[in-house]
Amino acid sequence: MKLRISLLSLTFAMAVFSTVTAHASGCSNSTIRGSYAFTIHGTIFLPDGSTLLVDGIAKETFDGEGNVTQVDAVATNGNLTPGWRPGTGTYSLNADCTGTQTISVLGMPDLHLQIIVAQSGNTIHQVVIDPGLATTAEGERVKASKD
């Protein structure tokens, strides 16, 4: 009987600890506070059936409250406009570290992304979900914000 009670107590303790650990490792908007360097690759599918290859880099800074600013340099078919193109946006992270993001760049339609945060907030994977775009980006933290 004592063995059965001990095993039941141990099982209960492990279940409680597992729940606390799972909760502690969850994500929120504050998980990705700071700056990240991204590499961007993909394809734009034009209405006439032709395609444009996309390659670039971006620096995105997340404020931990759902807002993001960014600059990027993106080439299409090997043509890059000199300088950094600024943008702003919003993001929302779920407890399971999946989320959504919207980026607005002057003179362009908004981009809508699905995101996954990994490695305790040190890595972000993005995919653009707008029709006609097959573009992904991988980002790694370059500077954490303590504010």
Residue ranges and their predicted role:
Residues 1-10:
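Bacterial N-terminal signal peptides that target proteins for export
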Residues 9-18:
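Bacterial N-terminal signal peptides
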Residues 22-147:
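Mature soluble binding/inhibitory domains
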